[in-house]
Amino acid sequence: VTGTTLGYSVGEPWNQKAVKKGFGVPVITSDVLWDNGADKVFGITTSFAEQNPNTTVKVVKALIRASSWLDENDYAHRKEAAKLIAQTNYIGVDEDIITNSLTGVFEYEKGDIRPLKSFNTFFTGQYGIPYYSDAIWWLTQMRRWGQIAETKPNNWYLETAQKAYRPDIYTKAANSLIAEGKMKKEQFPNLATATFIKPPQTSRLDGVVFDANKPTAFLAAFKIGNK
């Protein structure tokens, strides 16, 4: 596509591949715009979760262990992970291309290699926990840009988030790992008492304070978009 595409937005390893092959230069990385923003999601249907409760918990356990493994000991396992997913039956990209962003560096153009420690974070900072407040933020954006056609009251946002995000399943998986001695209790917040609503926070992207308890007020704070 060289010469036919002016720009694109894509995740790794495709930006680093563009640099290595000499047909692209990244302008900015998403973490500069949105620090610790969500990127990938694991989702299943309600019917699958209800019909396969044990399988569902086991899959979440595997995801928790894998994400913890990727972050532990100052990213000590990231090169091994890059070697695994570089295989043709997974991503099929050169190992050194994948290694860059996984190990905390990013090459903006050939020779311009900069540290980017938090570019990929999987477990540290409780990023894998399904917080209702995160779901509510996404829902406000869907309303703001018209994917949700009509105005919704505050309670709708939380009720909808609770249908999609399942911290109860995450908690079962975490407690099981702790009981098995595969994870430590200290690696998690107090899931038994958690509300799964984060405190109000200001986004680096737009500078507007987001309070998950007041989604309609958050929407009203923007000059552009649906309310």
Residue ranges and their predicted role:
Residues P13-Q16, V32-D35, F48-A49, R65-A66:
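Solvent-exposed loop/turn segments at secondary-structure junctions
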Residues V1-E12, K17, K21:
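Short helices/loops that flank or line small-molecule/ion binding pockets
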Residues I136-K227:
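Conserved C-terminal helix/tail region of periplasmic/extracytoplasmic solute-binding proteins
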Residues G24, A38-S47:
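Small-molecule pocket liners
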Residues K17-D31:
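Ligand-binding "clamshell"
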Residues Q51-R166:
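Secondary-structure end/capping motifs
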Residues V10, I44, Q51:
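A conserved hydrophobic position in a structured secondary element of the catalytic/binding core
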